[in-house]
């Protein structure tokens, strides 16, 4: 009898232990998973907040970036209007050479604009180039994207298109622009973009005629220096919390260019490119080189192939340097999660402005990167850019 009682008690005790262990095991599993989940949220964000909204612009004009960021923060579906606002703000504030006193006229003294915008969701592109008589070229480029089946309109036809949609006629060439052009003419039209012509393009203004092919020369290509305020193109990239991307660019073109020249701002993949499934990129530098290599497109495709933003940016710049040893310029790359990086060459350092991003450190903060060495440059110590200070009127606001 005593033995049966002991066995019964032992059985009950074993059942209780099994039940307790089961409860403890489930509780441990629950809290362990909860802890891992909390850690995942802390490191990477929830599924909803994994994407880091941000607004990036090239060079160090903080006010235009901040205006674009404020538009992006107004709600969903604002990436398009954000990049447009950034371009318009820079146009009105005369960022760099954009419409500043002594802007970038062509070799006939005329000031024309080019601009482009790209939708990363539909991969649609709208651009204008060589357009005279309209201040905010980005609005006309946006109209090309939204109201036509084309991607690029140029010259007087682009101006006529703008008029047909009600955009105000406003010719931008003024007395200051003419003075800059006259000074260039009095200096023998130096520098210019001609080659293998006669009379010599290094001493004369033309008109020119072609040299016979056996007299063609191949001088070392030496880039012009890019310094603070002496660039004529700015680009903006906007990414929202839903992963939607828009990129835009606006430019007054290379100074004293041959009339009719189209620059990188208007060419898909040269100055800007975006794909919501991968990310986006903006580039700045010698537009003719950028058009030959399409660095913004290459950067996005490099990320599609598995490279991280920093790897993609450096790979693109190294590729440019392999073919153009004196290249001056930069590329900024952003993946679809909002992780960004930049690389440059031919400058002491490259500046770009960021609002948002990881932890929202501050708004319109100027980020600086040291540039890659041009190890294979043919012209030793070729011209490089200098960016010693941020203009006082564009002091960095703190968020």
Swiss-Prot record:
InterPro entries per record: Ntn_hydrolases_N, Peptidase_T2
Segments forming a coiled coil: none
CDD domains: Glycosylasparaginase
UniProt keywords, alphabetically: Disulfide bond, Signal
Cysteine disulfide links: 90-95, 189-205, 344-371
Domain of life: Eukaryota
GO MF, one example: N4-(beta-N-acetylglucosaminyl)-L-asparaginase activity
GO cellular component, one term: lysosome
Tagged with keyword Disulfide bond: yes
Name of one Pfam family that matches: Asparaginase_2
Keyword Transit peptide: no
Signal peptide limits: 1-22
Entry-linked PANTHER family: L-ASPARAGINASE, N(4)-(BETA-N-ACETYLGLUCOSAMINYL)-L-ASPARAGINASE
Family, per entry: Belongs to the Ntn-hydrolase family.
Protein name listed in UniProt: L-asparaginase-like protein GG20738
